[in-house]
């Protein structure tokens, strides 16, 4: 399997604040040979990066010059047996190395946000459970973070996958 290049999720589906997080569940055991997800520690507290190239095309990953400025050697790679969970904030820089094994590395991803985090754009990953409140009540007020967020392309006209975007297959 291909690598998943360094990226931040919030650029794919920006919200009024940065509460969204993703919980990943490894379906199979995932060791270094499978290319587990890697996270850059504390990057959720840093800047948001432009995930468009110089031609203003969405690439779904950090630009080479931004990646060069990040200490990717500090990444924590999250290995674990089947059923292990990964958890990351929408601003966290993360990705994975190529899968060098004959074993797949399926990772079930579920995204959650506080009820007062409203999406700015169409979500490309539609689900019958979208906007389901799993705890608490619907918000009466939106919480707006003062830090800006670059908007993605108009996903309502179609979306393939992060893999296709990053491999320039979109």
What positions do the PLM features span?
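Short connector loops at helix/strand junctions that flank enzyme active sites
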Residues: 1-3, 18-20, 105
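Short acidic (Asp/Glu) patches
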Residues: 1-11
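Short, conserved beta-strand element in jelly-roll/cupin
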Residues: 7, 14-32, 79-82, 87, ...
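Short beta-strand-initiation
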Residues: 8, 73-75, 105
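Active-site-proximal flexible loops/turns
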Residues: 14-16, 48, 96, 121
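Double-stranded beta-helix
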Residues: 30-97
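Non-heme Fe(II)/2-oxoglutarate
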Residues: 85, 91-170
């Amino acid at each position: 399997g291909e690598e998943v290049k360094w990226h931040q999720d919030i650029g794919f589906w920006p919200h009024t604040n940065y509460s969204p997080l993703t919980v990943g569940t490894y379906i199979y055991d995932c060791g270094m040979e499978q290319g587990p997800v890697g996270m850059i520690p504390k990057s959720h507290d840093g800047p948001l990066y432009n995930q468009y190239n110089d031609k203003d095309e969405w690439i779904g990953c950090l630009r080479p010059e931004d990646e060069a400025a990040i200490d990717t050697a500090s990444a924590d790679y999250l290995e674990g047996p089947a059923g292990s969970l990964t958890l990351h904030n929408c601003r966290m820089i993360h990705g994975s190395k190529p899968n060098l094994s004959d074993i797949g590395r399926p990772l079930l991803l579920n995204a959650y946000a506080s009820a007062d985090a409203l999406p700015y754009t169409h979500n490309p990953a539609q689900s019958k459970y979208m906007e389901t409140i799993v705890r608490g009540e619907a918000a009466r007020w939106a919480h707006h973070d003062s830090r800006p967020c670059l908007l993605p392309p108009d996903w309502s006209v179609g979306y393939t996958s992060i893999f296709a975007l990053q491999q320039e297959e979109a």
